[in-house]
Amino acid sequence: MDMAVKQIAVRKSITVYAPAAHVFRTFTANQNDWWPRSHHIGGSDRFTAIVEPRVGGRWFERDAEGVETNWGKVLAWEPPTRLLLGWQLDSRFAYDPNFLTEVELTFALAAGGGTIVTLEHRNLERFGADAEKVAAEIDSGWPQILAEFAGYADAHSSMEAAS
């Protein structure tokens, strides 16, 4: 009997009208400047979103009082073309160091200029009985996050080129 588990992934893409190096840097080094304030798991909506720029680095938030809450870790760091994050939030969006799904972002040249950012949040079947529910929540959350990101990256690309 084949007991294969159905793989569940969410895929989204968006075009940012800026070079890949700027787009990658904006997603990682400037995440706090564009990350939606509504998307946090710590106790305060006043927080700093941080991606440590290396394999094994943390992906986390730090609130105004200095309390840090982990979201996951960096699994692959390949500027300016690829970032692989380990999402370590369970079905209640609480940090679990023993749980991991993957969020892969690729940054590719768009026809006519700019960068196509493709996001795949995969291994969602690992949520077990909650997989379909969590996939639906993730599917509705990433478009808002990517729109905030693209808007910020677009608005700041000419400023970077001028400096």
Where are these regions (language model features)?
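Hydrophobic-ligand binding "helix-grip"
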Residues: 35, 49-50, 64-114, 122
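A conserved amphipathic terminal alpha-helix motif
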Residues: 122-163
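Solvent-exposed alpha-helix faces
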Residues: 28-32, 79, 147
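Hydrophobic ligand-binding cavity/cleft-lining segments
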Residues: 1-46, 163
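Hydrophobic pocket/interface hotspot
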Residues: 23-27, 59, 74, 85, ...
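Short beta-edge strand/loop motif at the mouth of beta-sheet-based domains
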Residues: 30-71, 160-163
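Intrinsic-disorder/low-complexity, polar/charged segments enriched in Ser/Thr/Lys/Arg/Asp/Glu/Gln
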Residues: 7-15, 46, 58, 69, ...
